[in-house]
Amino acid sequence: MPRSIKKGPFVDHHLMKKIDEANATGAKKPIKTWSRRSMVLPEMIGKTIAVHNGKQHVPVLVSDNMVGHKLGEFAPTRTYKGHQADKKSK
């Protein structure tokens, strides 16, 4: 179920602090975060946020259609390399 409207969106305080500082200074440097659970807000549009996927930080350029989604949705954690080919059938 989606989050209740009366609760509002959730964003970690340390991430919001970094975004406010980047908006005030106009910095273009990616904002590194481990907070996959934070929701994308309109203040983040145009920023590059490096979201941790468990192994490395994946750069995510935030656009207007991402607002309302979680940051973790844009940094996949699993890599699928395919099933091994069946050598008997040849």
Curated annotation (Swiss-Prot):
Keywords: Ribonucleoprotein, Ribosomal protein, RNA-binding, rRNA-binding. One of its GO terms (cellular component) is cytoplasm. GO terms for molecular function: rRNA binding; structural constituent of ribosome. GO terms for biological process: ribosomal small subunit assembly; translation. It comes from the Bacteria. Signal peptide: none annotated. The keyword rRNA-binding applies. The keyword Metal-binding does not apply. InterPro entries: Ribosomal_uS19 (IPR002222), Ribosomal_uS19_bac-type (IPR005732), Ribosomal_uS19_CS (IPR020934), Ribosomal_uS19_SF (IPR023575). Protein S19 forms a complex with S13 that binds strongly to the 16S ribosomal RNA. Belongs to the universal ribosomal protein uS19 family. HAMAP family: Ribosomal_uS19 (MF_00531). PANTHER family: RIBOSOMAL PROTEIN S19P FAMILY MEMBER, SMALL RIBOSOMAL SUBUNIT PROTEIN US19M. This is Small ribosomal subunit protein uS19. The lineage of its organism: Bacteria, Pseudomonadati, Pseudomonadota, Gammaproteobacteria, Methylococcales. The gene is rpsS.
